[in-house]
């Protein structure tokens, strides 16, 4: 089969009742003949009714139930309409054909399935390339025209289950047939002329040959829908009747004239009246109009020329209600509530069922139909009256709002009227509810009658009495009558035929039902006996299981009691061990304190010895200073005796030397005082319990040794403990870290994670504080050392002039030595402090 012989199919689609357009699809008969035949027969409806569902195998009236943007649109479920139904012409489902064609371009038609070899009637049209569907879904066609209709459906709004909010219905579908064009007389003339030209023996060129080929090809093709003037054997007649077509208007081409709906005479009359009116240009009239148009509902003026915005005022309550915009009101009037729609549908269906079941009782039917029609007309009249009243009231309120402010009396009147109106509506609704309840009872009785026969139940299923609740938006209440689908009409016609056949078969069915009832009773009694025997057996098994469970529970309780007694004895032994440990700790602490006291006494003795040695060194330094002064005096006398002409210069130099020596004496005295103060501070610290740095260092080293010894003891004791615990409880293993972790807690209660975390954070804070204190001390010491070095440098500069004697040099060297000794002592103290801080951080 060539590509020219491929068949074409069309689908006329409506969106929310409006015709969207036609989708034309070309089928790949040569690649997937079985799937193409299934799709073609479902489009034409020539396959009859389904074997499983019992419904007509036809896409007409079905919907596109699934729409995914930038992916595909899916339809073809003519049985349920929600994607869970559908049936092929082969009965149920059929196997996949070869996956030759791929989903490598948009607008490809492919079969939907639930898995391999589960093709039914559902199909989908891709809107983008979808290579992930290759070798899963069978491609059997492509969209030739109507791509814009597919994109329009694709961009519809959907709910959470990808179902479009607007109803997308296949209004009509079928096959397109090719036909040859009629040959015109001009072509026949050309053929005659060509024959004469051959007689004259003119040679044909390539161009003429090509032209003839093109003519032959153009003769083939023109597409026709089924239902146009073609041979009856090839085509199927259309279902459109002449009665259904609307009447032609009087002026067919009147829509081409761009005129308004109002007649010309009335418009001319209005214009003339406006021209003739005396107050047309009066200022008073203009002001009145402006005031009338530009006031809020509370009476305030609206300034400005812009469009009015509808909003609730700030001071008003929700009960008061703002002015609803006119376009909102129009839309609200168009919408009908679900309850009203269900009521009307139920009445219609009840009426149709009564007609089908009781065709003889014409008088009763007429009376019932009259009642139903009257009730529906009353409801519609009530709705229209309510709409008219609401519009009039709104206009009247608007006029009163524009002219005057609302007084409290006016507000009370308004609320009283609204309450009365609501009461009237509630009374009307209650009457409608009573009527609907009666209708429901009647329908329930009818259902019971129908369920007597199996075929009547099938007819009920076909009519779909229990339809899903869907919100429907109609242009007016009258459109509800004309909103029946063609599918429902077809179902009704079939139901009429079935009713005629049922009257003939009722006698046979009654006999069959009697036999079936007897058999059913026997089977039910047998099933009851079997059920009772099974229940007794299950009851006995259940009792046995309960007894076994109780025995097992008793055994478990006894074991738990034995374990508890053993654990109590172990706790007592553990508490004894804990007491022994605490006693040992207290003893070790007392021994350590005695050692510390002895070391502190030794340190005090050392300090006293150092103080005595310091005092001796001070006395020696004073003696040396006196000797130096004597030497200076003798030198000055010799200089006076030797040099008689320069007495004034020598006297000036002597004075300078004396001043420098006095300064040195003062500095040495201040140093001696500082040393005494330091000694006093050390003695105070010892009395108050504080210790100097050297003593602290010695104590730390000793404490480290003790710790190492105690750690060794702890390790031994912990290893012994762990062995004993392993013997008791193999599951619980206590390491050294685990014991140290719970040191401060009693054995009866172990700490929680939160408590451990708090303890860790507290230690961290203490460590940081100690480090901060140490760093502050170090900073202050470094500053004091800098100051001392600066002072010494200044003094050395003052003593450095060349005219100074050897005595000054010796004094400066002494001062340098003292400064260096002090600096070295400070460095050693700082290094000791840094070591101590490191040891703390490591601890």
UniProtKB/Swiss-Prot annotation:
Span list, region Disordered: 178-330, 378-453, 495-843
Biased amino acid composition, Low complexity: 186-198, 801-843
Classification via SUPFAM superfamilies: Cyclophilin-like
Annotated control of activity: Relatively insensitive to inhibition by cyclosporin A (CsA).
GO cellular component terms, semicolon-separated: mitochondrion
Polar residues: bias regions: 614-642
Keywords: Isomerase, Rotamase
Example GO molecular function: cyclosporin A binding
Reactions this protein catalyses: [protein]-peptidylproline (omega=180) = [protein]-peptidylproline (omega=0)
Domain of life: Eukaryota
Entry-linked InterPro entries: Cyclophilin-like_dom_sf, Cyclophilin-type_PPIase_CS, Cyclophilin-type_PPIase_dom
Ranges where the PPIase cyclophilin-type domain occurs: 10-175
Residue ranges with Basic residues bias: 201-214, 268-282, 289-308, 578-588, 702-739
Segments forming a coiled coil: none
PROSITE patterns: CSA_PPIASE_1, CSA_PPIASE_2
GO terms of biological process kind: protein folding
Entry's EC annotation: 5.2.1.8
Task of the protein: PPIases accelerate the folding of proteins. It catalyzes the cis-trans isomerization of proline imidic peptide bonds in oligopeptides.
Protein name: Peptidyl-prolyl cis-trans isomerase 1
